[in-house]
Curated annotation (Swiss-Prot):
It catalyses: Xaa-L-Pro dipeptide + H2O = an L-alpha-amino acid + L-proline. Mn(2+) 2 binds at D246, D257, E423. The gene is pepQ. It comes from Citrobacter koseri (strain ATCC BAA-895 / CDC 4225-83 / SGSC4696). Coiled coil: none annotated. This is Xaa-Pro dipeptidase.
Length: 443
């Protein structure tokens, strides 16, 4: 494989091309991209954890340093002003020398407010991209050039097409997340609490709670029915029935986002349902290809859910077609089949149909689907179907013409297990699909 340095060099070439096109289209001279600033907790003197501007880390793998600035014009070597204060209270990152620094001009910035003296005097045609508009105004950036929608839409649209460097980083993030999932399963099998399972995951991945790309979902038993459960009980339940883990990792600012579900006892209907969801997920991935709308795969999985609901006699005496048509599958899988993945977990521009930002909303029947794009090579997506037993979603079906088709006794027996979700991260290629997660032998 090419070195990361060689891949990064080509990555910068691609970003420069996109920048040139965006600047020409919107009649700007350059973009000033701000890493962000620390924000103090209200009425306190310590900051919230720092989260870098995604458009900043698209250029450089600097994710932990506030008050940094990039100036890019699509022609000249990108300039990075790297915040390097004299500070004995806090850790100060040294000026970077790494695989990427040959491609960027790195300049020390000793004072956070010193950037003004470093920038070109004429700034009327510079666009600011960052989270602190008032800082841009202080630098005499025109208000109309602060986070200009057209520029951001353009950059967001093309972020769906990953460079080879980005794919390499995402494969590394997968490796880290897979290590965490293996450690977490072991912790579950040994009877640990959600809190301690989470610690095992973080230890195996070398991440802090603030390093993971999203809050880990570590859900035992009925907690698996809460789609974004993040509480972390300190005590293990008296009876272990099920474990759903939705947890990722980061590498150079790029995310992995994996989910697995395990049964404590493999001789149960629930354990067989996990196996069947897993098999259907793999079968769907095997059909994926460029040129097909992501929405189609979401709808297809509802047909697969219907098949499983019939097979397990959770819904009875109604055809699979009628189940999907009347949305009897909806309460069992209330979320979308997945989303784009990259610098952000729910990566941007999932609804964008072109580089002018044309929006195509999710179908009204499936409002929580996060992507409506036609799949193209270099796109990275999650495929994360699930089946859940959520009373608030099932309750409306307890009355009405379809109630008789729900096997309420079976549903009550499955509710203590919470639910099931299986999630892999896939890359669309010209001639097929790469499953980065299964390539690492994560069952």
């Amino acid at each position: 494989m090419e070195s990361l340095a060689a891949l990064y060099k080509n990555h910068i070439v691609t970003l420069q091309e996109r920048t040139r096109d965006a600047l020409a289209r919107f009649k700007l001279d350059a973009l000033l991209i701000h890493s962000g600033e620390l924000i103090n907790v209200f009425l306190d003197d310590h900051p919230y954890p720092f989260k870098v501007n995604p458009q900043f880390k698209a250029w450089v793998p600097v994710t932990q340093v506030p008050n940094c600035w990039l100036l890019v014009d699509g022609v000249n070597k990108p300039k990075l002003w790297f915040y390097l204060p004299v500070d004995y209270w806090h850790n100060v990152e040294p000026l970077p020398t790494s695989f990427w620094t040959e491609e960027v001009e790195v300049i020390a910035l000793p004072k956070a407010d010193g950037i003004g003296s470093q920038l070109p005097a004429a700034r009327g045609n510079i666009g600011y991209i960052g989270p602190v508009p008032e800082r841009a105004l202080q630098l005499d950036i025109a208000a109309s050039n602060i986070n200009p929608k057209g520029v951001i839409d353009y950059l967001h649209y093309y972020r769906a097409y990953k460079t080879d460097y980005e794919l390499a980083c995402m494969r590394e993030a997968q490796k880290t997340a897979v290590n965490g999932h293996r450690a977490a399963e072991e912790a579950f099998r040994s009877g640990m609490s959600e809190f301690d399972i989470n610690l095992a995951y973080l230890t195996a991945t070398g991440h802090r709670d603030t390093d993971v790309p999203y809050s880990n979902i570590v859900a035992l038993n009925e907690h698996a029915s809460v789609l974004h459960y993040t509480k972390l009980d300190h005590r293990a339940p008296s009876e272990m029935r099920s474990f759903l883990l939705d947890a990722g990792a980061e590498y150079n600012g790029y995310a992995a986002d994996l989910t697995r579900t395990w049964a404590a006892n493999n001789d149960t209907d629930y354990a067989q349902l996990i196996k069947d969801v897993n098999d259907e997920q793999l079968a769907l991935i095997a059909t994926m290809k460029a040129g097909v709308s992501y929405v189609d795969y979401h709808i297809q999985f509802h047909q697969r859910i219907a098949k499983l609901l019939r097979k397990h006699q959770i819904v009875t005496d109604i055809s699979e077609e009628a189940m999907v048509e009347n949305n009897l599958t909806g309460p069992f899988m209330p979320h979308g089949i997945g989303h784009q993945l990259g610098l952000q977990v729910h990566d941007v521009a999932g609804f964008m149909q072109d580089d002018t930002g044309t929006h195509l909303a999710a179908p009204s029947k499936y409002p929580y689907l996060r992507c409506t794009r036609v799949l193209q090579p270099r796109m990275v997506l999650t495929i994360e179907p699930g089946i859940y037993f959520i009373e608030s979603l099932l309750a409306p079906w307890r009355e009405g013409q379809f109630s008789k088709h729900f096997n309420w006794q079976k549903i009550e027996a499955l509710k203590p297990f919470g639910g099931i979700r299986i999630e892999d991260n896939v890359v669309i290629h010209e001639n097929g699909v790469e499953n980065m997660t299964r390539d690492l032998k994560l069952a």
